[in-house]
Amino acid sequence: MSPTPSPITQQDVPQPRSISLHEAFLFWLKLGFISFGGPAGQISIMHQELVERRRWISERRFLHALNYCMLLPGPEAQQLATYIGWLMHRTWGGVIAGVLFVLPSLFILIALSWVYIAFGEVPVVAGLFYGIKPAVTAIVVQAAHRIGSRALKNGWLWGIAAASFVAIFVLNMPFPLIVLGAAVIGFFGGRLAPEKFRAGGHSAAKKSFGPAVIDDDTPTPEHARFSGWKLARLAIIGAILWTLPMAMLTALFGWEGTLTQMAWFFTKAALLTFGGAYAVLPYVYQGAVGHYAWLTPTQMIDGLALGETTPGPLIMVVAFVGFIGGYVLQVFGPDQAFVAGAVAATLVTWFTFLPSFLFILAGGPLVESTHNELKFTAPLTAITAAVVGVILNLACFFGYHVLWPKGFEGQLDWPSLLIAMVAGVALLRFKRGVIEVLIGCGLIGLVVHLMF
């Protein structure tokens, strides 16, 4: 029997050293290539690397920043990386962290989107996607279950979720209107029955991993202190960064041009992503598929599958939407289809993520001014409940197009149903990872497609 190791004392833990911007740059670049697993997996990777291993930031400060990011529209993991980069190395540190979190996935998705559109009808590729599509349906069901089990804590919140499902599934109400309605209910409900709308949030840290570069008692650095002048300057810069490319697109292609409408549409989408990418996908479907016809329902499902299997935020599926729209509509002419797709993917990524940077750089000093619980979470609690109903509607939408590819008048696709059931059991019962489920179902689909 081996001797019991002696406990690690404070003296045994090496003291943290200052981190250069170059060292941080290399870490954020690495993170951009390994950030698989959706927001939960990405936040877990950052916690392991930055809190436990490198000790760049204490757990309490890490969770305090995460609580703020959870309140914002947009991808919380990317915003958390931006926040920590900003806190450590000022504005450029935040920009570098946020950009590198997204950039690798943008390049990867542009390449995969081109492979998909160019070779999607090849039997091997078609077979893989035949199995992946039912798996994506199961993944969306799992997302509704995961968010619902965390968010629907009482009858009020269950009622909001049910009402949102009816509103979008039966009444076909626009997603922004559902979000607004839920926020109003949460605003008044938080005052009438505050115990029903109390957000869970992330609990305060109870474990220490040793001293950190940014520790619990580390004073707020000068650049992270609130200043009205800094806020006004940032607002002006943000307005310029949005207005200039929008004005150029309008001048070159007109307001009704495809790229201009993509920029405007995804700006609105960026402000509605409460609850993560799954929450905004119904809005993207309503606009990109239903209104603008930039891509088909089947392509939308395939795009989500690609987004699930690449690093970076899942909301990067918008790059796929942009690429397919620009490529198929040939906005630069038939000889420049790839260039049009790549430009469209880059544009929608810019307009989708610009608000996230502004939220962090503008709100960060306000968050750093207090380490107490954030207020005004009741509307967000109600919105999260509504998101569950919206995601369930998305699962119904995917299921319909996958299981009845020719509509209800056609036959049920039994192999797809069986693959979806296998994926659901693997995800919900055996807790298997999303990527391995997609790979397994893709291989099953390939066998079925080649055999039949």
Where are these regions (language model features)?
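Multi-pass membrane proteins that catalyze or facilitate reactions on polyprenyl-/lipid-phosphate substrates
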Residues: M1-L72, E76, Y83-T310, L314-F452
